[in-house]
Amino acid sequence: MAQTSKYERVVLKLSGEALAGDDGFGINPIIIKSIAEQVAEVAKLDCEIAVIVGGGNIWRGKTGSDLGMDRGTADYMGMLATVMNALALQDSLEQLECDTRVLTSIEMKQVAEPYIRRRAIRHLEKNRVVIFAAGIGNPYFSTDTTAALRAAEVEADVILMGKNNVDGVYSADPKVDPNAIKYEHLTHIQMLQEGLQVMDSTASSFCMDNNIPLNVFSITEEGNIKRAVMGEKIGTLITK
């Protein structure tokens, strides 16, 4: 009997650090293969999946800005880093015979398709994995904001936030504070009021205004993406 997912269409947000694993920099081949296998498994269900990848494993725009670079230039470099990650993930997925398309907000026709909302939706309807790269194409906006915006544009049911080495949202950093409390459920307004570092405030406000749920969980545990898609209670669920 075919397994039925809880959601019809999801957006998976991966941080760049998640692709680096314990290496801290670059792309760990074992990690990206594991993530690709999990995404490919979800693609076989009755669920459409789009992926947004960060670029922090290669470059952070804010870091460059803090070191004296022009913020716009530093952010554009970060957008290019996300394209590198997207192409690496696409390659891993295609090795698993999973039909994949990379759509970039900055036009680079030789390596990817330009982002067009209707085209992205059509790819999803054809059960292709869609990877969004290059942020929203403008500096000063994070890939968290990209995830929120793209989720609204393609009418996704939820944003799945795969975190590196943390299994949900806590009241404080569990690595620093042993008394930190893990939340099973939060509202967007709670997240903003308590200053919980799930995503930046621009992305959080956008999700709240557009009623986009978030499910925050550990990406390092095998099978968690599928568990989240199937509706298992993992990590922290954030709703309006």
Curated annotation (Swiss-Prot):
Subunit-level organization: Homohexamer.
NCBIfam families xrefs: pyrH_bact (TIGR02075)
Pathway: Pyrimidine metabolism; CTP biosynthesis via de novo pathway; UDP from UMP (UMPK route): step 1/1
Localization annotation: Cytoplasm
Keyword flag Nucleotide-binding: yes
Protein family (similarity comment): Belongs to the UMP kinase family.
Gene Ontology CC terms, in alphabetical order: cytoplasm
Annotated residues for binding of ATP: K13, L14, S15, G16, G56, R60, N164, Y170, D173
Protein name: Uridylate kinase
SUPFAM superfamilies attached to this UniProt entry: Carbamate kinase-like (SSF53633)
Domain of life: Bacteria
EC number assigned by the record: 2.7.4.22
Activity regulation remarks: Allosterically activated by GTP. Inhibited by UTP.
Gene Ontology terms, MF aspect: ATP binding; UMP kinase activity
UniProt keyword annotations, A-Z: Allosteric enzyme, ATP-binding, Cytoplasm, Kinase, Nucleotide-binding, Pyrimidine biosynthesis, Transferase
Enzymatic reactions: UMP + ATP = UDP + ADP
CDD domains: AAK_UMPK-PyrH-Ec (cd04254)
Region spans: Involved in allosteric activation by GTP: 21-26
GO biological process, one term: 'de novo' CTP biosynthetic process
Entry function: Catalyzes the reversible phosphorylation of UMP to UDP.
Major subcellular location class: cytoplasm
PANTHER family referenced in this protein's UniProt entry, alphabetically: URIDYLATE KINASE, URIDYLATE KINASE PUMPKIN, CHLOROPLASTIC
Binding site for UMP: G55, D75, I136, G137, N138, P139, Y140, F141, S142, T143
Database matches in InterPro entries: AceGlu_kinase-like_sf (IPR036393), Asp/Glu/Uridylate_kinase (IPR001048), Uridylate_kinase (IPR011817), Uridylate_kinase_bac (IPR015963)
One Pfam family of this chain: AA_kinase
